[in-house]
């Protein structure tokens, strides 16, 4: 073999092969970089959008709308699961009561998109949190459907970064509605009017509270009526009361108390919605 082939062409071919290998790796790295960039951008866009999904509970169709936003000025989280907009005026009335005029269920998804878009467009890139920085969260979800009733728990929280700001607020607001009228069921409707019976129920709840806290039951020397706060819902088996930040001093951090159906029977209004749902018409 001529020497010029040995010392000229072969090295050149090796050089070309190595160059192709390097170029191939570079192109592979570029492709990986582009893929990762697309994934990151997609994830960011998804996190900055309103997520929606549909579900069904006991024959009622619901739509879940949620988003999370955070900036140096504030953060906000919304998570609503409400009946789908329909011609059913009763469900619309219930949604109006739950949203308290802040949003319209018939245009909820678009309203949340508009709200989030305005937050994004006004977002500042300053990494230092503002002096009045605050975090808010609001969720609404159904917890029970049955017997012609639907129950929701609306959870809200707000806290501030500044030590001089108001104390954090949080709590669960419960509501039970009639699926026939859309009317919210009140505490006065479910219990009878006998004062002694009302005291027995409150005293029972306080005893339950003491058991949870593993403390001595001092209910005979305490005004236990504070446990009636009209913040309740019921299921097929029990009555549940909820307590929030304004009641923590009295409940020592306990947020929920419940009483069983069987125990409550003697103290319910026999003409009220809960008695009729649990035990039928009294004969």
PLM-predicted stretches and their roles:
Residues 24-34:
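Bacterial N-terminal signal peptides that target proteins for export
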Residues 48-283:
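Compositionally biased intrinsically disordered regions enriched in Thr/Gly
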Residues 17-21:
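Low-complexity, intrinsically disordered or signal/transmembrane-proximal segments
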Residues 5, 13-16:
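Short hydrophobic targeting helices and cationic amphipathic motifs
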Residues 33-42:
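Bacterial N-terminal signal peptides
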């Amino acid at each position: 073999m001529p020497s010029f082939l040995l010392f000229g062409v072969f090295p050149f071919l090796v050089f070309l092969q190595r160059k192709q290998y390097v170029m191939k790796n570079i192109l592979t790295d570029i492709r990986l970089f582009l893929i990762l960039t697309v994934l990151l951008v997609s994830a960011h866009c998804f996190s900055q959008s309103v997520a929606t999904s549909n579900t069904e509970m006991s024959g009622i169709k619901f739509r879940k709308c949620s988003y999370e936003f955070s900036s140096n000025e504030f953060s906000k989280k919304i998570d609503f699961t409400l009946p789908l907009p329909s011609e059913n005026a009763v469900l619309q009335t219930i949604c109006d009561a739950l949203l308290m005029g802040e949003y319209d269920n018939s245009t909820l998804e678009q309203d949340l998109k508009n709200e989030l878009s305005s937050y994004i467009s006004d977002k500042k890139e300053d990494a230092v949190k503002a002096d009045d920085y605050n975090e808010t969260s609001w969720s609404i979800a159904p917890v029970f459907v049955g017997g012609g009733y639907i129950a929701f728990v609306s959870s809200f929280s707000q806290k501030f970064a500044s030590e001089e700001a108001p104390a954090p607020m949080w709590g669960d607001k419960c509501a039970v509605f009639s699926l026939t009228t859309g009317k919210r069921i009140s505490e006065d409707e479910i219990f009878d009017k006998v004062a002694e019976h009302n005291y027995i129920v409150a005293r029972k709840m306080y005893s339950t509270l003491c058991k949870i806290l593993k403390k001595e039951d001092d209910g005979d020397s305490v005004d236990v009526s504070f446990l009636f706060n009209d913040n309740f819902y019921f299921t097929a088996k029990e009555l549940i009361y909820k307590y929030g930040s304004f009641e923590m001093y009295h409940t020592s951090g306990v947020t929920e108390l419940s009483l069983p159906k069987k125990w409550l029977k003697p103290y319910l209004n026999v003409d009220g919605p809960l008695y009729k749902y649990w035990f039928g018409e009294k004969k």
